[in-house]
């Protein structure tokens, strides 16, 4: 059974990279950015103010995503079981806060991330909470 905290954090970090990939790609690909903009609000890619807002949105969320990834991989370097467990708890709480809005929106029939991304966002939440409660060195 998977109980090694560092392995669970590695799985979480890989899931983070996979779920953030479309966001990172949107920063460098005008086609992907336009797709996301039009998927969210039709006609927004034609409005210069909306484009600016989306550019800021993509940049802020890309940095947040990068922070999640870096924090997860840095936490893997800790050697103390208690520190690893507390780090897992803190990371799990942040990941839950990141994932929860999409799940609330889907239950309310509002726009949300694609289901694959939503499922990927659950992997870190579950693995990090599990590491906090049951993890071993």
PLM regions with names:
Residues 97-117, 132-137:
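Membrane-helix boundary connector in multi-pass membrane proteins
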Residues 45-55, 75-86:
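Short juxtamembrane and helix-loop transition motifs at transmembrane-helix boundaries
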Residues 5-9, 82-91:
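Membrane-interfacial loop-to-transmembrane alpha-helix junctions, especially the N-terminal start
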Residues 23, 72-76, 102-105, 127-131:
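Structural signal for membrane-spanning alpha-helices in multi-pass inner-membrane proteins
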Residues 64-79:
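Transmembrane alpha-helical segments in integral membrane proteins
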Residues 14-58, 62-63:
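Hydrophobic transmembrane helix segments
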Residues 1-15:
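Alpha-helical transmembrane segments and their helix-start/interface "positive-inside/aromatic belt" motifs
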Residues 71, 86-103, 119-127:
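Hydrophobic alpha-helical membrane segments
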């Amino acid at each position: 059974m998977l109980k090694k905290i560092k392995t669970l954090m590695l799985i979480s970090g890989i899931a983070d990279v996979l779920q953030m990939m479309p966001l990172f790609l949107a920063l460098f690909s005008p086609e992907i950015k336009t797709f996301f903009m039009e998927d969210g609000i039709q006609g927004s890619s034609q409005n210069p103010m909306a484009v600016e807002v989306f550019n800021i949105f993509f940049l802020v969320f890309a940095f947040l995503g990068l922070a999640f990834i870096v924090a997860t991989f840095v936490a893997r370097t800790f050697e103390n079981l208690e520190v690893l467990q507390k780090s897992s708890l803190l990371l799990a709480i942040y990941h839950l806060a990141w994932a929860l809005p999409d799940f609330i929106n889907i239950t309310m029939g509002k726009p949300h991330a694609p289901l694959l991304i939503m499922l990927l966002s659950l992997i870190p939440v579950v693995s990090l909470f599990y590491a906090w409660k049951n993890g071993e060195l």
